[in-house]
Curated annotation (Swiss-Prot):
The lineage of its organism: Bacteria, Pseudomonadati, Pseudomonadota, Gammaproteobacteria, Enterobacterales. Gene3D superfamilies: D-Amino Acid Oxidase, subunit A, domain 2, FAD/NAD(P)-binding domain. This is N-methyl-L-tryptophan oxidase. One of its GO terms (cellular component) is cytosol. Keywords: FAD, Flavoprotein, Oxidoreductase. It is an enzyme of class 1 (oxidoreductase). Monomer. It comes from Escherichia coli O127:H6 (strain E2348/69 / EPEC). Pfam families: DAO.
Amino acid sequence: MKYDLIIIGSGSVGAAAGYYATRAGLNVLMTDAHMPPHQHGSHHGDTRLIRHAYGEGEKYVPLVLRAQMLWDELSRHNEDDPIFVRSGVINLGPADSAFLANVAHSAEQWQLNVEKLDAQGIMARWPEIRVPDNYIGLFETDSGFLRSELAIKTWIQLAKEAGCAQLFNCPVTAIRHDDDGVTIETADGEYQAKKAIVCAGTWVKDLLPELPVLPVRKVFAWYQADGRYSVKNKFPAFTGELPNGDQYYGFPAENDALKIGKHNGGQVIHSADERVPFAEVVSDGSEAFPFLRNVLPGIGCCLYGAACTYDNSPDEDFIIDTLPGHDNTLLITGLSGHGFKFASVLGEIAADFAQDKKSDFDLTPFRLSRFQ
């Protein structure tokens, strides 16, 4: 049997692509080395931020606005436990922060609902937060956070119900191209399709070693926090930049536990075995202390944590491009620790590719050729 589309890697982007391509009427095979959602990639840990006024660059704003529309649509499948929670996101940092300047510029260019607060305004609205006098806050009222594992589970179930074939716990070991399309090799045999999407996350280089993607071990952890830090008390999700440039992110507390992580740093790794569990690297448990001590001093001790992996590109911008020499294979990789919020729209882009539709977005900034 020859499929219209084979998806290699069915985590965040792959799960979305499987659903949108199947819904469009294509004959699709989703594959994954594990059983998604799982703990081996970049999507576990329950929650991920979604920010609209994008500090990483204005080029992402059209993508994230479309992503938000798709998240809202997906959330309607889980109204009792919504996938998107509009908690708002407060971006904290020094007034001269380049990241915050980008946030402000994105908001201005796209007329986004962002409120600027000085240090006193921040602390008056959220007494739990402490910042120096030279800090500002840019509050995105329409942003919030996503339930990442629930989203993937929902997409996979919807795709299955729509007739998508799914081959999980079965790694793809090789990809071959010929005039008839794409063939993948697995322990279960070979499968063929007209087109393929490669969104295999951190270990994409096991299949395509020439790609400029660097795996980095990262951690996040949950700390004691009472109801003052909850959504019910209107405590927001947040990003925060310390004076030394370190970047942190976090979420409102749930069940008396507040999740926080450090975006920069981490440990470069070269195999899955090197991604050791949380607390096996000495700095894991204390990584968030500089932020907690200075910005959220009322937060208690570390309860537990987890390790995940970033698939970093050299400039930490996405790679969305066809495989060189093979226009029937689309790469979506190098998401560099800020990709989950875009999973919905990237899945839609993948489905459009499989249908020979031109993308509605300017994907030029994400081409591989920028590294040549």
